[in-house]
Amino acid sequence: MKEQAYIPQPLDTSAIVLPKDLDVLTEQLAQNVHAVWAAGRVADGWTYGEVRDDVRKTHPCLVPYDQLPESEKEYDRRTSIETLKCILAQGFTILKQ
């Protein structure tokens, strides 16, 4: 059987604008995205290292979120923002109780 190349088709969320009242949630989700990623790495035997080394299993981003470089925080924020936009695009409402 011939394998077909995977062609990603993410939901188009370009028209979705997140309300400002979701800014705090966006940052909290970004922090959690990092924590989940880091926990997975640590569980697999990775530790902090100044440079990423796949053989030694070291990674410079195995630090608390507030110690990440801004570029890494922005990566996690983009993941959070796209997740929230996808939820809204599907017709859900996000309400804090």
Predicted feature residues:
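Alpha-helical propensity feature that highlights long, continuous alpha-helices across diverse contexts
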Residues: 1-97
